[in-house]
């Protein structure tokens, strides 16, 4: 999971085990190639973040990599909070089909990204794109915003 602390935009992929190769691939594909190279990345001290491959990538990209304090989960409080919200959204989608949670990850991320955040005064989508997302229900019901686009 990657979170932009300013906009609260969340990127997440499902994986059975977090390896250094997975982390490096995530940073390149889900962060750098989509939003540009970050100045700094804060991560936990999991083995996926401590591998030589990730260290080399950070050096090549010029990214400062900071690790959170061990045994102090409050350092990653935002990540833990958002991950909990994503898990709640997924659990409402899957009900008893827990083996299929990864199939609902993108829908859960969409729901989170387009939900109003009181602390920000906007949705993460709005802060990233400069406008609110056009929701499928608005198209279905021909909302004023859809009619104005026509």
Walk through the language-model features, giving the residues of each.
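Integrase module of LTR retroelements
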Residues: 1-150
